[in-house]
Amino acid sequence: GDYYRRQLELMLQPGTPVYVPMNPPKKNGGQRLVELGGLALSFMMAPEIFWNPLSQEVKDSLAVRMLSYGEGGTYECNWRFFNVNIMSFFLSQGYHTDKAYLEELLQILLAAYRGDGWYHDNPLFDYYSMWAFQMYGSLWSEKFGKKILS
């Protein structure tokens, strides 16, 4: 875990190869949004390795940086899960997030359900329709949904 935690610190430092800049307000974060959404899942699934050992200063800096992507724009498809995962993780840790935007994205994702386990990935059915919605939706529901929406 030490290697990964060091990389998290480096992503906050300009001039390092892994530096991640702030995302301009409401701008689509592109591929960085995807990567940070995955990072939020890592924090969620293994906090004892990736999140808990970090200093409060690093946690706070990661929250600001990652929320600039999570609260930013997204593509109108399964990518909404990346925003949702980022915002939900930091909300669960006591950070302020745009709850209205989070709820809006969740409602849109729920509306994509077409029955019998199928979701459309706006506007098509594609390979994400058969796994991304089920996996990300189930993880979100188990880790956050029961807590955040209660």
Please place each PLM-identified region on the residue numbering:
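Aromatic-lined, polymer-binding surfaces characteristic
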Residues: 2-150
